[in-house]
Design a protein with these regions (language model features):
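Short glycine-rich anion-binding loops that position phosphate/pyrophosphate groups of nucleotides
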Residues: 63-70, 128, 166-169, 180-181
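Structural motif
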Residues: 9, 60, 119, 160-162, ...
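NAD(P)-binding Rossmann-fold cofactor-contacting core
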Residues: 123, 138-155
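Rossmann-like NAD(P)-binding element
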Residues: 153-172
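Adenosine-phosphate binding glycine-rich loop
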Residues: 176-205
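Glycine-rich adenosine-cofactor-binding loop
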Residues: 100-107, 112-137
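Phosphate/diphosphate ligand-binding glycine-rich loop within oxidoreductases
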Residues: 2-113
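Short amphipathic alpha-helix with an adjacent loop that forms part of the alpha/beta core around
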Residues: 49-54, 151-157
Length: 205
């Protein structure tokens, strides 16, 4: 589909942007014959990014670490889930009226539901962690939180560990011996992205 004056723009803001969102959403727009494009942007100031959204009439955007909590200061309305979680990752712009949603919890909920577990340990207590905690509460999964200042406890952990901190590639060794099972989190990312697409397109899946 050719970009024209009527093409809607969606984007994401992150301190460490990647290409996954661009690949996913642009393919979805094309497959559904929707006149829209998606672009990932680097940002170190979410307030300025929000101003750009309003100036350029960007229809919707995602935020990732470290903006999932701070973004709440710059929107006009919070969804019920965002009010409960205290963090957002998806924003809709309707004539410069911004409403915040959270789709992270949907991905976490659907993934955790397949595990059929009663307890887990969550690493980190940022925006994504808050969504995982919300999902755990809905599923009645008991959890404890390990924050960065408690990192010395990590090698002693047993059972299910849900890492909600940024992962950097390290080919030299392992922080934790993850046997017998590890999951990269790609399935959670896909689940939440599909939920974002529904919000961006008013229900199209």
């Amino acid at each position: 589909m050719l970009v024209n004056k009527d093409t809607k723009i969606y984007c994401s803001f992150s301190s460490n942007p990647g290409n996954n969102g661009c690949n996913f959403f642009n393919k979805k727009f094309q497959s559904q014959n929707i006149n829209a494009i998606y672009k990932s942007f680097y940002s170190n100031n979410i307030k300025n990014s929000v101003n750009a959204v309003k100036c350029l009439d960007i229809k919707g955007f995602a935020v990732s670490m470290p903006f999932k909590v701070e973004i709440l200061d710059y929107v006009d309305e919070l969804s019920k889930e965002v009010k409960n979680i205290g963090a957002a990752n998806t924003i809709i712009n309707n004539n410069n009226y911004l409403k915040a949603y959270n789709t992270d919890w949907v991905g976490a909920y659907n993934y955790l539901d397949t595990l059929k577990i009663s307890s887990l340990t969550i690493l980190g207590n940022g925006g994504f962690s808050k969504a995982v905690q919300y999902a755990c509460n809905l599923l009645k999964i008991n959890f404890n939180i390990i924050e960065r200042n408690q990192w010395n406890l990590v090698p002693q952990l047993e059972g299910i560990i849900f890492n909600c901190t940024p992962i950097e590639v390290n080919t030299r060794g392992k922080l934790i011996d993850g046997r017998p099972f590890t999951s990269s989190g790609k399935s959670i990312a896909l689940l939440q992205a599909n939920e974002q697409f529904k919000i961006y397109t008013n229900g199209i899946s």
